């Protein structure tokens, strides 16, 4: 087994990172270029490290080409928001910016437990970053080869424990921020210094690929821990955080028709005391920094490093670097995932209202005024908001005397709708068209009508009060987490998807491809057949994903490196 990085020519991303002068590149010069609406050359990649992606409106490409115009280039910004916690005052600020300075006028909640602005034109970029800074926010390292936004269970019911794990999410996020002053210099007009910069943890060429961390509090796997490179499973005693089980090597991205790529669930390393959290996290990240493949970006994620060097080798390397020995994994189990909708009361007697936001898109339309509703709530709310990893939002910390007012506003603006089915609440999609340049098929715009058709099928089979974890993603990169769904659709081309079946309801089993390149009609026919059988043949409390495996409709994925593509 080769435990060293294979000798090969480094990918071009490695060159541009080293040549970027600690992520500066010539971004500042491109900002002054009024000839084009976008960035050029290496800067297209470098702005990702500052939390932005260069995109264009794909709906308008043909029209603008006919008009001999460049594409409608704009930027998507993803905010750094560890644990998804945002104050009402911050919300008021981002609402105002989205309304006045974005092409689409929306706030998009994401599976990384934060929000995104879509459709920001280049002249508005500096003002956007300055606004975030004035609100105590930033977008540092929410994209690029960095530690991304840190996820944390959105469970304010266990108030003390939740606050403790959220504090660790913030500590981890801060600890692994890049030390370069490039962000402040470029976007905040910070003073340029002549000092020699260093990146003691990330290194001058940063990480081989993006790196994702989650903290989860059992029994609710609301963050889909197996989608992340590094996971901390909270272990408590008498309601107090005492330590974490550590899992590494999860990840969902793959490439169509490339059998060397695959999704993977995370592997257990062991248990650590809570005081060792940062040391272990740093040891894991530096191990991946040094052992990750920098020649082939398709194999650069931690999951491939683990497969190449082996779990035990990786574990021992982490122990040596941290000076800490892992203990045996403490018992834990997951019983559900997703979000707990409606009102719940925490042990501190505060109330928390979880709102379903379909596909995370907060916008006013002809049917509902979700954005106005959130704005009105933010104007009076005295607690905070918690964005969830399932693209929903919690109105947290509501005193009993304010419950009625909050609920009235939520109902008035369509943020609460008693007609939303369990199936719709269990369905999720990535953004895809028109802004994502990687999308091969529709996802967010496709899902609502598709779910309606699935709801009708389930009602016909007497399953109207049941749910199936359903995910749609426009490409195989995994943003919609279809590779942890019971039914996963992955875009192949316009109007066609690969269909995956057999994930479980708690997010611990990867589904397997059932049919390739299907139309919506063909997918619905399969869902009709399999849910009909599920309704007739299921065992008590047996989920759809478990049923299709037990019934032999699909074989379970046991070791994705070996059998995912079989």
From Swiss-Prot:
<protein>
    <recommendedName>
        <fullName>Sulfite reductase [NADPH] hemoprotein beta-component</fullName>
        <ecNumber>1.8.1.2</ecNumber>
    </recommendedName>
</protein>
<keyword id="KW-0479">Metal-binding</keyword>
<keyword id="KW-0028">Amino-acid biosynthesis</keyword>
<feature type="binding site">
    <location>
        <position position="436"/>
    </location>
    <ligand>
        <name>[4Fe-4S] cluster</name>
    </ligand>
</feature>
<dbReference type="GO" id="GO:0019344">
    <property type="term" value="P:cysteine biosynthetic process"/>
</dbReference>
<comment type="pathway">
    <text>Sulfur metabolism; hydrogen sulfide biosynthesis; hydrogen sulfide from sulfite (NADPH route): step 1/1.</text>
</comment>
<comment type="function">
    <text>Component of the sulfite reductase complex that catalyzes the 6-electron reduction of sulfite to sulfide. This is one of several activities required for the biosynthesis of L-cysteine from sulfate.</text>
</comment>
<keyword id="KW-0521">NADP</keyword>
<dbReference type="InterPro" id="IPR036136">
    <property type="entry name" value="Nit/Sulf_reduc_fer-like_dom_sf"/>
</dbReference>
<dbReference type="GO" id="GO:0020037">
    <property type="term" value="F:heme binding"/>
</dbReference>
<dbReference type="GO" id="GO:0004783">
    <property type="term" value="F:sulfite reductase (NADPH) activity"/>
</dbReference>
<dbReference type="Pfam" id="PF03460">
    <property type="entry name" value="NIR_SIR_ferr"/>
</dbReference>
<dbReference type="GO" id="GO:0009337">
    <property type="term" value="C:sulfite reductase complex (NADPH)"/>
</dbReference>
<keyword id="KW-0408">Iron</keyword>
<feature type="binding site">
    <location>
        <position position="430"/>
    </location>
    <ligand>
        <name>[4Fe-4S] cluster</name>
    </ligand>
</feature>
<comment type="similarity">
    <text>Belongs to the nitrite and sulfite reductase 4Fe-4S domain family.</text>
</comment>
<dbReference type="Pfam" id="PF01077">
    <property type="entry name" value="NIR_SIR"/>
</dbReference>
<feature type="binding site">
    <location>
        <position position="475"/>
    </location>
    <ligand>
        <name>[4Fe-4S] cluster</name>
    </ligand>
</feature>
<dbReference type="InterPro" id="IPR006067">
    <property type="entry name" value="NO2/SO3_Rdtase_4Fe4S_dom"/>
</dbReference>
<dbReference type="InterPro" id="IPR011786">
    <property type="entry name" value="CysI"/>
</dbReference>
<dbReference type="GO" id="GO:0050661">
    <property type="term" value="F:NADP binding"/>
</dbReference>
<comment type="subunit">
    <text>Alpha(8)-beta(8). The alpha component is a flavoprotein, the beta component is a hemoprotein.</text>
</comment>
<dbReference type="GO" id="GO:0051539">
    <property type="term" value="F:4 iron, 4 sulfur cluster binding"/>
</dbReference>
<dbReference type="GO" id="GO:0046872">
    <property type="term" value="F:metal ion binding"/>
</dbReference>
<dbReference type="InterPro" id="IPR045169">
    <property type="entry name" value="NO2/SO3_Rdtase_4Fe4S_prot"/>
</dbReference>
<dbReference type="InterPro" id="IPR006066">
    <property type="entry name" value="NO2/SO3_Rdtase_FeS/sirohaem_BS"/>
</dbReference>
<keyword id="KW-0411">Iron-sulfur</keyword>
<dbReference type="GO" id="GO:0050311">
    <property type="term" value="F:sulfite reductase (ferredoxin) activity"/>
</dbReference>
<feature type="binding site">
    <location>
        <position position="479"/>
    </location>
    <ligand>
        <name>[4Fe-4S] cluster</name>
    </ligand>
</feature>
<keyword id="KW-0198">Cysteine biosynthesis</keyword>
<keyword id="KW-0349">Heme</keyword>
<dbReference type="InterPro" id="IPR045854">
    <property type="entry name" value="NO2/SO3_Rdtase_4Fe4S_sf"/>
</dbReference>
<keyword id="KW-0004">4Fe-4S</keyword>
<dbReference type="GO" id="GO:0000103">
    <property type="term" value="P:sulfate assimilation"/>
</dbReference>
<dbReference type="InterPro" id="IPR005117">
    <property type="entry name" value="NiRdtase/SiRdtase_haem-b_fer"/>
</dbReference>
<feature type="binding site" description="axial binding residue">
    <location>
        <position position="479"/>
    </location>
    <ligand>
        <name>siroheme</name>
    </ligand>
</feature>
<dbReference type="GO" id="GO:0070814">
    <property type="term" value="P:hydrogen sulfide biosynthetic process"/>
</dbReference>
<keyword id="KW-0560">Oxidoreductase</keyword>
């Amino acid at each position: 087994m080769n435990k060293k990085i294979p000798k090969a020519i480094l990918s071009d991303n490695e060159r541009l990172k080293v040549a970027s002068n600690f992520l500066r590149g010539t971004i500042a010069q491109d900002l002054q270029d009024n000839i084009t609406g976008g960035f050029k050359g290496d800067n297209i990649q470098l702005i990702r490290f500052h939390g932005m992606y260069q995109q264009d409106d794909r709906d308008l490409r043909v029209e603008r080409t006919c008009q001999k115009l460049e594409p409608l280039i704009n930027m998507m910004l993803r905010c750094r928001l560890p644990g998804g916690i945002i104050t009402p005052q911050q919300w008021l600020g981002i609402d105002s910016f989205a309304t006045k300075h974005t092409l689409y006028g929306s706030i998009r909640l994401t599976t990384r437990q934060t929000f995104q602005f879509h459709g920001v034109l280049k002249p508005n970029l500096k003002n956007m970053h300055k606004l975030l800074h004035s609100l105590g926010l930033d977008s540092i390292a929410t994209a690029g080869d960095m530690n991304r936004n840190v996820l944390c269970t959105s469970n304010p019911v266990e108030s003390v424990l939740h606050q403790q794990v959220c504090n660790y999410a913030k500590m981890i996020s801060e600890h692994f921020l890049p030390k370069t002053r490039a962000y402040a210099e470029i976007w905040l007009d910070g003073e340029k210094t002549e000092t020699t910069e260093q990146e003691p943890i990330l290194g001058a060429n940063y990480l081989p690929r993006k790196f994702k961390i989650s903290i989860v509090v059992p029994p609710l796997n609301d963050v889909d821990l197996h989608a992340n490179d590094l996971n901390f499973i909270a272990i408590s005693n008498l309601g107090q955080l005492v330590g974490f089980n550590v899992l590494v090597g999860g990840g969902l991205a793959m490439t169509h028709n490339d059998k060397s790529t695959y999704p993977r669930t995370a592997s257990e390393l062991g248990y650590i005391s809570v005081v060792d959290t940062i040391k272990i996290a740093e040891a894991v990240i530096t191990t991946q920094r040094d052992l990750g493949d920098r020649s082939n970006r398709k194999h650069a994620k931690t999951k491939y490093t683990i497969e190449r060097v082996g779990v035990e080798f990786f574990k021992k390397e982490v122990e040596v670097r941290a000076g800490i020995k892992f203990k045996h994994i403490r018992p834990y189990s997951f019983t559900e995932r997703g979000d707990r909708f409606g009102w719940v009361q925490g042990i501190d007697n505060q109330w928390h209202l979880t709102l379903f936001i379909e596909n995370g898109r907060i916008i006013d339309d002809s049917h509902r005024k979700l954005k106005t509703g959130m704005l009105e709530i933010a104007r009076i709310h005295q607690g905070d908001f918690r964005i969830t990893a399932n693209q929903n939002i919690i109105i947290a910390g509501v005193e009993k005397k304010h419950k009625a007012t909050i609920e009235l506003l939520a109902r008035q603006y369509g943020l609460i709708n008693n007609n939303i089915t369990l199936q719709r609440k269990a369905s999720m999609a990535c953004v895809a068209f028109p802004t994502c340049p990687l999308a091969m098929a529709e996802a967010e715009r496709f899902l609502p009508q598709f779910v309606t058709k699935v709801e009708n099928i389930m009602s016909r089979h007497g399953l109207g009060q049941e749910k199936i974890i359903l995910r749609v993603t426009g490409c195989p990169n995994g943003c919609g987490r279809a590779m942890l769904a019971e039914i996963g659709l992955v875009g192949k081309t316009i109007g066609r998807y690969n269909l995956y079946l057999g994930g479980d309801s708690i997010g611990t089993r990867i589904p397997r491809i059932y049919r390739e390149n299907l139309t919506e009609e063909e997918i619905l026919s399969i869902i009709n057949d399999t849910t009909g059988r599920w309704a007739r043949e299921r065992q008590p409390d047996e989920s759809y994903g478990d049923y299709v495996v037990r019934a032999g409709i699909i074989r379970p994925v046991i070791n994705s490196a070996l059998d995912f593509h079989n």
